[in-house]
Amino acid sequence: VADVIIEMKDYFVRYLKKGGILIISGIIEERMDEVIAAVESAGFSNPEPYVKEGWAAVKFTL
């Protein structure tokens, strides 16, 4: 799932308005930092990660 999210990061920007919220999930905890960096590089900010039992979800603001 991490690879798909990273590949789609630019699509998320196209379909959300400024100030919009993006929530992504199904990320293996070990790849969370990589996904956060990629999504931030597309213009999102304020990542709020949630981790449970090795899985992560992250909330971003555009």
Write out the residue ranges for each language-model feature.
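S-adenosylmethionine
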Residues: V1-L62
